[in-house]
Design a protein with these regions (language model features):
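Active-site-adjacent structural elements that line small-molecule/cofactor binding pockets in enzymes
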Residues: 1-314
Length: 314
């Protein structure tokens, strides 16, 4: 049975304690399986880096608007919800020291009794890397080393690690995650490097595609499975999940093969095609800039389509 989640209002004018809590609690009541928080630490006033996750290729949140911290938001929601999974989509690993953010993530997993999904990525905005004094060109290697260290932190008692970027000498790291044997790692990113990272370290490949067909998504996942096999892993240990933008319309819209736009019925039909190729979990980002209208779409989709989609079997 496939699962469905929605993105949280962690940025923009709507970002507040009350809307964040209401959005998560309402998603839980409506039957969504997960809520997702995006990650941004600073917002440069001038961004030349191409944004890969919008049709216009420009970042969608102005720099003078709030953007809450993803880890803090999920820690807050651990105490405001009971069942829904709490996900990062995705946390940029090179911005933070792995001992620090792993401690926070493990604490959230304990406080939520095992509901955290650790969505991780290497980042894309060179200007933000510069502000954080983080190595943009080495972000992939830094991220891989962090993921290697995490495995030690969550499974060993006397931890020693000597890497190119991080060194640890005989430390303890407790508590361990609530989930066993460790937190689920969902590796974001769309290209071959991300696919290899998911195959080596991930419990899921978790790309965000603005435009994608189920067939193309499956092609990418088959790359992940092949890479997993070459590393000696069982390919079945890595599942397929993804985030997809959604534009709901009041009436049927002309079909667009690579984009989820149309009536609730049209979007649900397209999502069934993603289930058919084996997508286990889909995070839906409803592309409405104003929060009240966005929440209305989240409610309408849940009432008119979600139960049948969750029950649909490929």
């Amino acid at each position: 049975m496939s699962k469905f989640g929605v993105f949280l209002p962690v940025s923009g004018r709507a970002a507040s304690r009350q809307t964040l809590m209401q959005a998560a609690q309402r998603a839980e009541a409506l039957g969504y399986d997960s809520v997702w928080a995006a990650d941004r630490l600073v917002m440069p006033w001038k961004i030349d880096t191409t944004y890969p996750y919008s049709k216009e290729a420009t970042f969608i949140v102005p720099p003078d608007r709030p953007f809450f911290d993803t880890l803090t938001c999920l820690a807050f929601l651990a105490g405001c919800t009971e069942r829904i999974q709490l996900g990062m989509s995705v946390m940029v690993m090179p911005y933070r020291h792995p001992l620090h953010w792993a401690k926070i993530a493990t604490t959230i997993d304990q406080l939520s009794t095992g509901r955290l999904i650790l969505g991780v990525g290497v980042g894309w905005m060179e200007e933000e890397f510069a502000a954080m004094n983080a190595p943009f060109k080495e972000r992939g290697k830094v991220s891989d080393e962090q993921l290697t260290l995490l495995q030690r932190l969550w499974t060993e008692e006397h931890i020693n690690f000597h890497g190119a970027y991080y060194r640890v000498e005989d430390i303890a790291f407790n508590p361990k995650p609530y989930q066993k044997p460790r937190l689920p790692i969902w590796v974001g990113g769309e290209g071959m490097h991300a696919q290899r990272r998911a195959a080596r370290y991930g419990d899921a490949w978790f790309p965000y595609f603005v435009r994608i067909t189920p067939r193309r998504l499956l092609d990418g996942f088959e790359n992940v499975r092949r890479e997993a096999q070459t590393t000696g892993r069982n390919p079945d240990e890595v599942k397929l999940a993804c985030c997809l933008p959604v534009e709901l319309t009041s009436a049927d819209a002309p079909p667009i093969e690579e984009y989820l736009k149309g009536s609730v019925k049209q979007v649900a039909e397209r999502l069934r095609q993603f289930i058919d190729v084996g997508v286990a979990h889909i995070g839906l980002q409803f592309m409405i800039p104003h929060y009240p209208e966005r929440q209305e779409q989240i409610e309408r989709f849940a009432e008119e389509a979600l139960p049948a989609l969750k029950a649909y079997q490929r």
